[in-house]
Amino acid sequence: MWEGLWIATAVIAALVVIAALTLGLVLYRRRRISLSPRPERGVVDRSGGYTASSGITFSQTPTTQPAERIDTSGLPAVGDDATVPRDAPKRTIADVHLPEFEPEPQAPEVPEADAIAPPEGRLERLRGRLARSQNALGRGLLGLIGGGDLDEDSWQDVEDTLLVADLGPAATASVVSQLRSRLASGNVRTEADARAVLRDVLINELQPGMDRSIRALPHAGHPSVLLVVGVNGTGKTTTVGKLARVLVADGRRVVLGAADTFRAAAADQLQTWAARVGAAVVRGPEGADPASVAFDAVDKGIAAGADVVLIDTAGRLHTKVGLMDELDKVKRVVTRRASVDEVLLVLDATIGQNGLAQARVFAEVVDISGAVLTKLDGTAKGGIVFRVQQELGVPVKLVGLGEGPDDLAPFEPAAFVDALLG
């Protein structure tokens, strides 16, 4: 019995000694002081190898507005019952003001031009309005050459009749020479024969083979450019508007240049025509440089892909050298942007000899390519057409027959002569 007790005591004592040794060793290690310096902790490179020269740019994060917080008072929170307690105050119903519906603004209405009157109707009006010319030219000549053989006094009467009708010396001499040759053949026996001969001679004098087309077709890189010149009071601006109406009706995109900057009424008139026919218009302040406005009009025509640019120039007297030089400047400046295809001279058919003096000066300055005779319905003569072509060497391309939008007609020699003879 005692032997077992001693063994148990020895085992317990051994365990106590082992535990004491272990505890002492742990305490010893914790209290040991190291005399070597502790290594410094380095900064860990987390750049991924990118440097300032690696092409990456840095930008500031855009500031975002915080989302508007919703008022959750009275609403169940997380963990609350799904139903509102009976003792909770009831939420009132409030009227919420909603913004009124605003309809989208309608696009401005594009004015639609009235349908162009057919050319046949215009030629009939030409015949009727030139009826007064028969006394001076048509009936007078028919009465002379339809009576049979003519002596020298009769031929002098024929010549005087032509001069009174404003044909001018050159055209008169040419017509008399042709009539003498045709009547000398002896084939003219009746008044109808005389009328047929006179008709052929007058048509031939108007040179029906001349090109009377308006050069208004666009080029590959820019629109065609038409310059309209003339003195004040000839209907120049009205002619530009009427021509624009015809071009727009033909499907052309037209830009009007209001280069008549000396009269505000001229630019306003052209603006009205543009709105009426559906064309664009370029204008400057009153007194602006006409050449600059003309240049801007061509520039806009090119940018907008227009087909035609019509430039209305300031009316000027042919005796004013400074104003004529300015007209030359307008053409030169426009030519820097695009070539000028047509220079139309607008003449008043009622002014006779003075109109030819104007035409000669304009032809020398801007090299006109065609003439437009306005107010042809107001003349009792009509011979100015022959004289313009004879002395200027350019065709009469258009004739104005009144103030109506369709009273601008293409000039056709045969129809004009028929209107003269009735």
From Swiss-Prot:
Optimum temperature is 25-37 degrees Celsius. InterPro entries: AAA+_ATPase, P-loop_NTPase, Signal_recog_particl_SRP54_hlx, SR_rcpt_FtsY, SRP/SRP_N, SRP54_GTPase_dom, SRP54_N_sf. The keyword Ribonucleoprotein does not apply. GO terms for molecular function: ATP hydrolysis activity; GTP binding; GTPase activity; signal recognition particle binding. It catalyses: GTP + H2O = GDP + phosphate + H(+). Pfam families: SRP54, SRP54_N. Optimum pH is 7.5-8.0. It is a peripheral membrane protein. This is Signal recognition particle receptor FtsY. It comes from Mycobacterium tuberculosis (strain ATCC 25618 / H37Rv).
